[in-house]
Amino acid sequence: MIIIGGGLAGWRAAEAAVSEGASVVLVCNGAGNSPDIHALNCPVLTEDSVEQYVNDTLSSGKYQNDRRLVETMCRESKSLKNEFEFDSVLIRPLGSTVPRCVSINHSIGAIALAQIKARLKGKVSLEYRTVTAEEVLEIRASDPQVKIIIATGGWCGKYSFSTNPPYLKGDGLEIARALGGALKDVDESHVQYEPTVRLEGSHRGIPVITTLLYEGARLLDPQGMEFLSDVRLNKDELSKAIFQNGGYAFYDLTHVPDERLKECNMDLMERVIKVAPAPHSSLGGIVIDPKCHVLDADGQIVKGLYACGEVTAGIHGLNRLGGNGGTAAMVFGSIAGREAALEIKHDRER
């Protein structure tokens, strides 16, 4: 099995595949955005439910999501609370009706990656390099039975001002297309902007978490006037509000408690930060089913080909609910690895 991609989705796929007895080669040129994932969604409160989580995700996506994928993600996310010792503090991301964003020291992405890599040490063959569509075609031609999982992330790295590493340019899309997979929603209208991204200094391109708007933070327009009448906007709506009020804003953290800023690993001396919306997540990509099989233009399974994480389409609709990027990577990474490994077992039994 070959897994292309070294973020959370790729490593979760590797762990699931290894647990099913598969031999795995993981090829990547970095961890993508995964180390920067602060939190993920998991319905752990008694007043929450899978159904409410599904509804929030569909509402945030303007009901353009693939409901089957949404239901799978929300249902399977419940198992994450048995895998990780989340902090007791829950966050309500913009667009959610109840708090369900959980983390470990506000660094779930980096911590989960480190834990998975430690568990898989010596069990996965790891190569750091870029994989091209031409190379994958040659591999498939020499071994038609090889299983391939694409977990290469999105394409927002192609923008000059972005939260993404510059190597995230959509390579996985070309690989899927070359192998017969269908693509959906790979256009500018399916790029989600992170509303509050640092514009200046050495931290340019680094987001400032929007959940602080619930905890005393304010957004000021270029003239220093507060312009938000409702902090319950989702990220898409918040980005539009900033664009309509001068194109950038000052994130005023003056009234956020010091302890809260320390928890977020923020400089207490930096109380007003110049921010602007920046491309953050690509919402379209490779078409998959709930078992992460890649589908062709006719909706048929492309045998032996799987995809998971931000490289896929359908989960988020027209707007990703805050916290769902990490959840989707975790859930569908595991599904892709397990299903690919089970297909290997099935091939051997025939």
Model-identified regions with their sequence ranges:
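Glycine-rich FAD pyrophosphate-binding loop
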Residues: 18-38
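Glycine-rich active-site loop/strand segments that organize a redox cofactor
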Residues: 41-73
